[in-house]
Amino acid sequence: MDHAVSSLQYFFLILLCLSLLVCSNSDDGSKSRTKTILINFGDSNSDTGGVLAGSGLPIGLPHGITFFHRGTGRLGDGRLIVDFFCEHLKMTYLSPYLDSLSPNFKRGVNFAVSGATALPVFSFPLAVQIRQFVHFKNRSQELISSGRRDLIDDNGFKNALYMIDIGQNDLLLALYDSNLTYTSVVEKIPTMLAEIKKAIQTVYLYGGRN
């Protein structure tokens, strides 16, 4: 049991450290002459409309009622943490990667989809979001070489701020849908972290450094 508790504490310590790192990087980016580009992966904590575009599920009021005053695809009544990052960086809110209607990808892109998991048990798990990122980067480079100027270039991908906020749904599924013991749930955490590690390694392989 002590080992299980220490593993769970270690998991949340990693999440805290990553959050602090993102905050630090976002402050530096706001002072830089180069406009910060933000690329996000995750679940409902940072989904700005991915599940709406991807599934067609109607997500209307009361979602969005206190700030946007309309449904935006966010599963909440106002802004998300990623929205506050965008405001701090003086940039528009991130467009979902899956949104085909007038998206704006010049300052970033959001691959997050509500319900997403670190492990491959959902239609848009982290591994799929990473593959979408690879396609997005390759396609952006193709279009830029053809004359497009409204997309992220190679230098932009290199210097972009990358965020990954995922894992809560894995724990919820394990705790409430699988009838696992607490110890068994905690034992799944290293596998979840391995998926996040692979995602970070792929982002690095394709030029991401922050």
Annotate each PLM feature:
Residues D2-N210:
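Conserved active-site regions of diverse hydrolases
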